[in-house]
C-alpha cells in the first residue's frame, strides 16, 4: 500500500513539474527610443509587471516558470538598462528585476509561435523623456519653412527587418537584416555626398522598428522619398534578380508579389508589435484612397531605380511590381521597396555579402533617385529648376557657393568661359553638381 501511495505522489509531482514553463533564452535589443527584452519560453505563461523607484527598477514575475540559461549583461551602449537580476520565488515562480539607468515606461505582452520562434514574452522599456523630446522635435519639424531658403531633398532610408526579426536567411546563414543594413549605410553615405540631398536612417542598428513606425519616422522628418531595402526570397532557389515594388491598391501584380507581401507584412508579428500604438488619425490616413499622385511618383522613381539596378546585375522583372506592402502606404510620400537580390539563390547570397557589390547596389539606387528628381524636384528644394538674376555685388563664386554647385558646373550650364557677369543677367543653376 505504501508503495502504491508513493507511486501516486510521485506521479502527481511529475505532472505538476511538467506544467512549469521554462525560459530557454533571453535576448536584448537596445534601440534609440526603447530597449526590448525577449524571453523565449517553451509554452504560454502568466506574468505580472510593476515599477519600483529609488532606485528605478522594473520587476516582472513569471508564474510557474524556471530559468535554465545564463542571462547576459546589457551592453554599455544601452541607455536605459543597467543590469538584470533574477531569483526563484516560492520554489515555483521566477522574478526578474531590471535595474535601470533612468525611469522608463514599461510594456509587456505575450506572443504566440510563428515560423521562426516559439512562445515569447516581450518587455519593452520606453524612455520616459522620449515622449516630450519626440513631441518637441515633431513640432519643430512641422513649423513652416522659410520661403527664402532652399532646402535639401530628404530621403528616408529603411533597412528592412532588424533585431529579433532576421528576415529571410540564405543557405550560408546570411541574414537579410544584416545585408540590407549594410547597403542602407552605404546608401546613406552616397546620398550625403550628393548635392541637394540629405539622408534619414529609419533603422540605424540591429533592432526592430514596427512597420507603421517606419512610415511615421519618414513623415516626422518630412521625407520627400521613402526607400525600403530588402533581400528577396522564393521557394525556387533558381529565381534571381533585383525588383522594385510600389503600392498596389487592387492586389499584387504577380504570384511572387503576393507571396512576398505576405512574408514582409508578417514582420510585425515576428517583431512583436502590439496594436496599442495605432492611433485613429494614422489608421484613417492609411485607409484614404486619394493617393493617385503619390502612386504615380512612386512608379516613376521606381522605374528609374530599376533601370539603374539593371546595370549591376540581372533584374527579376522588367517593370516595377505592385504589392500591398505596409511600409509603402504613406499617402503623401512617394515610396518604393527595393528587393536587391534573392538570398534564396546561392550565387546572389554570395553577391549580397560582398562589400563592393553592396556599394554598387547603393550607387545604382542613388543614380535612379537622381534621375527622377532631376526633372521632378519639389519647389523650394536645391534641385528644383532654378535661375538667378544677377544683382549688384554678385560674383560667380558667391552664386555657386549659395546654391551648392561647383564653379565649373555653373560655367558649363551657362556657356561661360570666364567669371564675367552683368547686372540683370539670368543664370541657370544646374540641378546636380558633378553629374
Language model segments and positions:
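Signal-peptide-cleaved, periplasmic/extracellular N-terminal interaction regions immediately downstream
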Residues: 17-155, 398-401, 406-408
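Solvent-exposed coil/turn segments that connect beta secondary-structure elements
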Residues: 31, 42-44, 52-57, 62-67, ...
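Active-site-adjacent mobile loop/cap segments within catalytic or ligand-binding domains
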Residues: 47-49, 60, 235, 286-382, ...
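Catalytic-core regions of hydrolytic enzymes
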Residues: 133-280, 291-303, 408-411
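Stable alpha-helical elements in mature extracytoplasmic
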Residues: 176-179, 183, 187, 214, ...
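Extracellular LysM carbohydrate-binding repeats and other cell-envelope/extracellular binding modules
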Residues: 386-392, 401, 406-435
